[in-house]
Amino acid sequence: MEFNKLQLSHCISFYISDVSEVFFESINQHPSRDFVNNILQKIKSTLSEEELEKLNTIEEVTKDEKILIMLNHVLKKIVSKTGSSSCDLFQIVKHDRFNEPVYIQSVNAFENNLINNEFAERRYDYLIEINKHSYLRKYVNAIRISFFLDLRAQILSGSFTLDVINKQLEHQNKEELFQAIYLRSLIKHFISNQLYPISLNSFIFGDKNRENKTVENDKLSVLKNNWNQIFFSKYFDFVAKNKEERVVDNNCDELFYATMNTLLIMLIIIEELRVYFNSKEPALILKLLDNKVSLREDPDQNPETDLHELIKFAEKNYLEKEKTSRWHKKRVKSLEELLEEIKQINLETKNESLAYPDEIVELELDNVHNFVSTKQVFRHQLDLQTLHGIVINPERYGIGMWSNHFVDWEEFKDLIEQITDAENGSDLYGFEKDLDESICQVNKKYLTFISSDSSSFLIIKNDQTKVISNYVWAQLYFETRRWIINDIEYDLYEKGFDKSHFASNIALLESLNFNWLDPFYGLTSIKEIMQKIDSKSNLKTSIAEMVAKFKHEQRISKKDNERVLMIFAYVAAAVVGFINFFSMVFTILTVSDLNAGLTPANIVVIAIASLLALFLIVIAVLFRFRWKYIKH
């Protein structure tokens, strides 16, 4: 049994809220492509020019080819600010009717069957291939953008799938394979721990003086120094012992800028999607794109300059109008303080952020006809057992995303050599237990496995069957929901319960709830995967508990309001009582003879009235303090 091909992808989810009603009207207007291509064309001939123009406007805003043009325009903006005249960051797919380059293509991952056609209209899948001569190739080979217009939740759920390893392994050294996996794990560890949350604020802080780059440079230097410290101590000091220092430094720098620039490119794409899908008039944006727009500047820049240009571009286009927060540079003396500053600024801005990177590893094997038993496939295959362990239980190998001590390459290599040495034997019982717990799907063409926290998948297949798309969309479905819950919990932790948002949060969470009759974006093939993910993560239970929590707080809030009204009622009664009391006293005492009103009967009445007034005061004070205590 030989390894034929290995592909490792990082899936990074996002969502965009407040999607304009125009897009859902467009979807409802033409629920399927067959309707558009056949029936709608006949209807158009009976409409007036005004009705026809309105119909075309609504129809076009969700068309796959129109979204592709919009996304390509974003990529053209990025290309105009980066790279060189001889090497763009992205591979050119073709040229459009204006002879302008097209850097993105649509991906048809699933058959467009008639039953689930209404969901296919809301699924978008695109691929951006990285230029093989670009420094971005140090980190990523291709970027896949997948998103879905969720009519029920009124959001756009999406993910970026980064193809970070794509190797033919026919003559590949196994050590080189594990080295590539180790390096990508180290990058994921850095991103998750140093750049959380992954947002524009991780790269940009506002400053009144746009020409003053001190703030930006200081912050980037913190990240860059931390990167150098981690990557040299964990990796480059061991793999580049016999190489020139200049070459090693250059490799480390290029990898840093490739990673940072890739993240920035994704964030810029999200912001452009947000601008478009939040727009009340998206048709106006499309009309502008129908004209020839040439943005090519062809700068000759190095990767560091690209990073600064992308930051400047993002700051000008996405932060300048709504960003008022400034970075308190004097307050930031360490990375922890830097991350805290980012967190506070994120609370004050509306820009979207990315989820943690999830991992999908797809391995193609040679000389395997059908998978009959998982244990039979793994028996006596120490390399395969090791790969399973690294992907499904990376913490055991010291390369987990949250590992307290991330092992260096030398330690990791020694551990792999020890495990894959047949003379040392293997803990077959322990491995089979892990295997049984991690099984997700068993098919004669492929086997799939899932980690305990649902953040990693391993796909083992015996031919070129396309399996990864199912897992990309399953992770998108799951991670979007988990990410929204995390955002709500984060706001609760930082801001407390906001009574004005109770109803909207409850409605959003209930729209995200699901059962096993859910259409799952019209992809029935991901239902089994979602069941396995939920068994590990308890996503359904988490949503239900969050809804119950908000409803409980809503009931408490209503009771608080009732108590406030009660206090006001007592205060009003007290005021009326005092007025009546003093009216009565002055009525009794206003006589010509001062002693005439002081009869036993009048004194008793005044005493009783005074006592009742005192009771009213005591009750009002007690309720006031009790209400403050309950609120606290």
Curated annotation (Swiss-Prot):
GO CC list: plasma membrane
Keywords from the UniProt entry: Cell membrane, Membrane, Transmembrane, Transmembrane helix
Location in or out of the cell: Cell membrane
Superkingdom: Bacteria
Membrane topology: Multi-pass membrane protein
Membrane-crossing segments per the record: 255-275, 506-526, 566-586, 603-623
Protein name: Uncharacterized protein MG242 homolog
Organism of derivation: Mycoplasma pneumoniae (strain ATCC 29342 / M129 / Subtype 1)
